[in-house]
Amino acid sequence: MSKIYHQISKKPGFMKHNGGLFFRDLTKDKYQFKTKIKKNHINKVGITHGGYIASIIDAGAGTAVYRSAGNKVCVTISLDIKYIGSSKIGDEIIGDVKIQKVTNTLVFMNCELRSKKNKIAIASGVWKKLNKKL
């Protein structure tokens, strides 16, 4: 698997516009992504906006799901996020994704989002496999 992170937000779109994500495969069912918090990710109280946290979990975990599904396009059916900490400008955020199960039509995963100082969020989700490849 890879020790090196690769930019996954190369094409114009939401994630590239918001700073992009870096991603790496750890094992056949464990993946990791990261990004750095910037000024435009912060809410009025000075911490990372919850919507941005949800977006990076959806994009990072979605990439893990895509790879675990044999590079088939998958769409999010459900994503349950528990916000349990915060981050601020300059923090590097790391997401650890564990694929729990892959069926003929669905992929189940768990994700933990953290900075060096604390756990930020935990999530679980289900993705639907489509019969498409990118």
Locate each region found by the language model.
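Terminal targeting signals and extreme-terminal segments of soluble enzymes
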Residues: 1-134
